[in-house]
Amino acid sequence: MFLERVNQKTGEREWVVAQEDYDMAQELARSRFGDMILDFDRNDKFLEGLKTTIPEKKKENGDGLVHVLDIANITFPGTGTGLLSLMAAREGADKVTALEVFKPMGDCARHITGCSPWAEKITVISERSTDVSQIGGTAADIIVAEVFDTELIGEGALRTFKEALQRLAKPGCRVVPSSGNVYIVPVESHLLKMFNTIPRINGGEDEHPLGTCSGTASVFDVQLSELETHEFRELAEPIVAFKFDFENEEKIIYNESFVREAIAHTSGTIDAIMMWWDIDMDGKGETFIDMAPRWKNPKHYAWRDHWMQAVYYLPDKKCVEKAQKFEIICNHDEFSIWFSDVGKDSTRSYCVCGLHSMLSRQTVYHINEMFEDQSFRAEVDRLSSGLNVVTVGEGSFVGLLAAKTAKTVTIIEPNERFRDIFHKYVLYYNMKNVHIVEKVTHLIEKPDIVIAEPFYMSAMNPWNHLRFLYDVEILKMLHGDDLKVEPHLGTLKAIPECFEDLHKIAADVNTVNGFDLSYFDRISTKARAATDAIVDEQSLWEYAGTVKGEPVELLTFPVDGRILSRKCVGKMDNMQSSNGIPIWMEWQFGDLTLSTGLLSTSESRKPCWNKGYKQGVYFPITNLQNESSINLNALFDKSSGDITFQFKKFDVQSGN
């Protein structure tokens, strides 16, 4: 078996051979299914749908027998834990056929359902519904399926329902959920705009260094509940973009476009379109799963991370005036949704500048935020003034900022596509003092200073940017130890935090809706305990919480050209009131401290996290969850360029 890994010293993706005893349960443990199973609002409403449809079908069928088909996709463990199948059997289904394509989850479902009082009723098949031609004799009377994602249809819900109704179900088959609605709200928001706009060095609306590319139409999934209300303005009331009938195969159409009308209740520019959906669980319009953000539906809001809200961008700038009627074209194909303006091309837009297709939304935001950060720009100006500057990184725009005051700037950029993008910026802004080379070894003359953010596009977490140390090592070998480098120091930090909800992604599920799912916990916990501690990467600004102490310094990295393996044992206190440990890097850049994580803390201990980076976060495994203090062991291995973590009980007697 081959697994893909990133070489943290070079950024290259490599295939490694897994050991013969590699346990796929480790992948299950890393996949973070916990919050899906602990989504009690969703569980209860699926249950309500089954409570409605099973008695109806028993009454309709002459023999009083009901066959339920439970369909899961690879991203959701509805079948994987057997939860929906168990619900159906307990509510009176005479036969339940469960489909689960992900083998570890299918095995888990077989064990859980096999140990239940309804074992004889439930059959688990490890195949996709679209690959199954028959399900054991009788066709299904009811389909219960959790095949949704942030876009509602992105995991193949339309084809799943259409083909299941055609091939695996009886005429008149009920579906739980029966239908879905997609809602959109056009908003003005400088913040959301920063996740899509091509970075402009001077911030002018008339600057087009990469042409007039509108970006990609792909979904930007985000926890909109964590946006502050002052960070956007709704320009109209929610619009119903699409209505999907999951019970009528003839009405399930893969490609559709609709013109939807709205009235602006305030003037502004449509910088973004917010989207969410709801689904009707009983077919009566009485029980809904509603994905509206907290500020839109505070009374019935339910947090979840397996589904989020979404943001889209129109291909062209559109302004509206108060009381003006305006129209938006709403489009979808089998898997995706996009929006366009009336009178313009409504086909799905794609990035033509190369920037959006290479970078995550988060990185586009990071570059825009860096360009707007006047303190950072002033420090770059000061450090670069009149000097021959070299910048290192992968996809780092800092060299373009240094050009303002530097005598010369040499951007070392290993990525060919980024070299092309930087050449376009250099030509557009007439930066005659900027040169671009591929490798550190291509630098012939000794520079006065090396500058970096540091930023490497291939980095998955903040400490992956330590690749910077290896670039500096080569530069100092070539040009001498006296070569000045900024930043001159990096620090790995951590802090205990009590998250309102995020910890649920790694929480034990135990008993859910009266069903014992603890076997799922056993295989997940065993797998997590058998590996190095699993530190997730999360955009922590999207998740509410309060910090329970001060940052703890774990490892320091002097940027002096000498790379040494390092280790530490840090004590994390206040863990009895915490459920997670965020981890990030800080860099001393001249007179500034640049944080990839915690930026500030409010009086109420609410943290402000850097939106331009993902942070690491560790969720204590079961045997550490009741400890008041735990030890955090961090080891940086110079041979791999990576950091591994271990978390252990704090030994009071030994003090470690």
From Swiss-Prot:
Domain called SAM-dependent MTase PRMT-type: residue spans: 12-338, 343-656
Domain of life: Eukaryota
EC id: 2.1.1.-
GO biological processes: chromatin remodeling; methylation; regulation of DNA-templated transcription
InterPro entries: Arg_MeTrfase (IPR025799), MeTrfase_PRMT7 (IPR014644), PRMT_dom (IPR055135), SAM-dependent_MTases_sf (IPR029063)
Major enzyme class: transferase
GO molecular function (one): histone methyltransferase activity
Entry-linked Pfam families: PRMT_C
UniProt keyword list: Methyltransferase, Repeat, S-adenosyl-L-methionine, Transferase
PROSITE patterns: SAM_MT_PRMT (PS51678)
Function in brief: Arginine methyltransferase that can both catalyze the formation of omega-N monomethylarginine (MMA) and symmetrical dimethylarginine (sDMA).
Family listed: Belongs to the class I-like SAM-binding methyltransferase superfamily. Protein arginine N-methyltransferase family. PRMT7 subfamily.
Protein name listed in UniProt: Protein arginine N-methyltransferase 7
Organism for this UniProt entry: Caenorhabditis briggsae
